[in-house]
UniProtKB/Swiss-Prot annotation:
InterPro entries: D-mannonate_dehydratase-like, D-mannonate_dehydratase_GalD, DgoD-like, Enolase-like_C_sf, Enolase-like_N, Enolase_C-like, Mandel_Rmase/mucon_lact_enz_CS, Mandelate_racemase_C
Any GO BP annotation: carbohydrate catabolic process
Protein name: Uncharacterized protein ORF2 in unstable DNA locus
Record family assignment: Belongs to the mandelate racemase/muconate lactonizing enzyme family.
CDD domains, A to Z: RspA
Pfam families: MR_MLE_C (PF13378), MR_MLE_N (PF02746)
Gene Ontology molecular function, alphabetical: magnesium ion binding; mannonate dehydratase activity
Domain of life assignment: Bacteria
Amino acid sequence: MSRIESVEVFVASPGRTFVTLRITTTDGVTGLGDATLNGRELAVASYLRDHVVPLLIGRDPARIEDTWQFLYKGAYWRRGPVTMTAIAAVDTALWDILGKTAGLPVHQLLGGRSRDGVLVYSHASGTDVPSLLDDVERHLELGYKAVRAQAAVPGVGGTYGVRKGRVYEPAASELPDEQPWDTEAYLDFAPRYLEAVRERFGFGFHLLHDVHHRLTPNEAARFGKSVEASRLFWMEDPTPAENQESFRLIRQHTTTPIAVGEVMNSIWDVQHLITEQLIDYVRTTVVHAGGITHLRRIFDLAALHQVRTGSHGATDLSPVSMAAAVHLDIAVPNFGIQEYMGHADETAEVFRTGVTFADGMLHPSDEPGLGVEYDEKAAERFPYQRRYLPVARRLDGSVHDW
């Protein structure tokens, strides 16, 4: 019987920092998992090396569910982003191994395709309305059928949502970049630039917007009402999700769909939002929510309550996680949309992925397993670089949700 023989943890920064787990069995089969937690990469790497790896040696790689339960329940201390990201890496690697052993792509192990492709959206941004419109046009010309639109708020020095190079990466400094925030200016400006997008390009594509937890429930309700004419696919994270009952107030005042869950990492975090139908899309992602095994549970719960999936997929997901996400997306019946930003050229030097983009959709690899390879030698050219996400401050200097 095959057993887990070795487990390795790699930390490298090819374009951005990724933590990659590689499990090798006694039969010589390898599986990859993503353990990247933006700004806390070394914490997860240490948790894996010091606490998880010793538990895996000698285990049966095919006992995926048992291993998940062992790592979750056996640790006593449960949930949290570090723990769930570490478990996700192991779980994803074991699914990769199972697919390779069976000679099947992971989506076939999950029940096969429910659709021909995975609808994705990417990020259009600008320092002002004209540059935003140019970027929306660029994405539509690339074939995207769904675009998220963000523009810098006039008079505010912060640049959240604004492209900073080939691939927008907010975690770009060794210490947090402190950015000012003006809620009233945002509430005045954002509806107008979303309206400008619709006036220029019409309604023949999906338009999304990320509020990024920055509004109170009342402000979020006001914003949702103000953008109804633009027919958003969703407004994302309109208010901090810790106060889950607040979404009931938002629901009562606007028909703009709501997407929540990017910063959540377990089914218990989103259970109330789903069962009370306070959201339309759940944005938990494979790397931060316990891997394919646990994310499938979240999606199944969501399906019972007519909530669709819309997983996080920014550049803090390595190509390993993106491949796992696409395999799951194409299989589940209640798929909605998948975020997809692409990666830097340096990332492609380290990760080879079989995921392809065409006509606004991603398509999973038909290779056995996830269809991703990791080039350890190439990764050595990109040593770890510490990077933090920004911090927002109101104009009075107090810390605000970024």
